[in-house]
Design a protein with these regions (language model features):
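Exported/periplasmic ABC-transporter solute-binding proteins
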Residues: 1-91, 96-271
Length: 271
């Protein structure tokens, strides 16, 4: 903390890589409005943010998954208070392919067959499309296991009790998945819809064969029609301190929620 009259209040905000762009945008805008408050934002994954709360070194953990019962228990044991949960917005996990891939839509089951350990889909021709640039082999891009995105995709797409098929390229962050997909004609990967570029295509996703396939967008995420959308959370230890609460309240205000939309996420459902 700075000395003298120009006292700066620091808020340590760590966690989800999915939320990193959003958290940085919030922090910058808040600093302009409140020059005496500095929100220090870092990534590292949802699990890292929660570990930071449990260890008492982080004020706010950003999470793209809900806190696990074991984590909540640890936080309570360490500090004697329950963690508080705030829903800050929604993230639509898009399924990305190369922009020249002729495939337009996919089902949850097909994704499980591509990414799951018992899955039998390994070639684009099995999905009824001519392989992009003659590259028929499907190149799977995934995330590391400390990522909330990895956990959520696994729970949603891969049959219960099963793991990811080995041999995927596991990327550090959301952005890297999209960047490598853009350079790899045979690639398929998953990442927040906010990371889309002109170099990739987002597939429509259907819950099951014969169902209507929906695009990843705000409307379909809020209605529940798009099957791979999830809440984005902030967690604090116990009730947040006044300066931390003021920040979270601002992030949830109409002004803060505009930032959510501007960074490609879905504003939090109205209470």
């Amino acid at each position: 903390d700075g000395g003298g009259d120009g006292q700066t209040t620091n808020i340590q905000n760590k966690g989800s890589d999915t939320m990193l762009q959003l958290a940085q945008a919030w922090s910058e805008m808040y600093a302009k409005k409140n020059p005496d408050v500095r929100v220090a934002v870092s990534g590292g994954g949802s699990g890292t943010g929660i570990a930071g709360i449990i260890n008492g070194v982080v004020d706010i953990a950003n999470c793209s998954r809900a806190m696990k019962p074991g984590e909540a228990e640890k936080a309570k044991e360490a500090h004697g208070v329950e963690a508080s949960q705030f829903i800050m917005g929604l993230d639509c996990l898009a399924v990305y392919v190369h922009k020249d891939n002729p495939l337009e839509k996919i089902t949850i089951e097909q994704l499980g067959q591509i990414f799951g350990e018992d899955g039998t889909i390994t070639k684009w021709s099995q999905l009824g499309v001519d392989p992009p640039e003659g590259k028929d082999e499907i190149v799977r891009l995934s995330r590391q296991s400390n990522s909330g995105t990895y956990v959520y995709f696994k729970e949603t797409v891969i049959p219960e009790g099963k793991s990811f098929k080995p041999g995927s390229l596991d990327m550090h962050g959301s952005k890297e998945v999209v960047e490598l997909t853009a350079k790899t004609p045979g690639a398929i990967g998953y990442s927040g819809m906010g990371y889309a570029t002109d170099e990739v295509k987002m597939l429509l996703v259907a819950k099951k064969d014969g169902d209507k396939a929906f695009a990843p967008n705000n409307e379909n995420a809020l209605s529940g029609d798009y099957p791979i959308a999830r809440p984005l959370f902030m967690y604090t230890l116990g009730k947040p301190k006044p300066h931390v609460k003021a920040y979270i309240d601002w992030c949830l205000s109409p002004e803060g929620q505009k930032v959510v939309e501007a960074t490609g996420y879905v504003p939090a459902p109205k209470k």
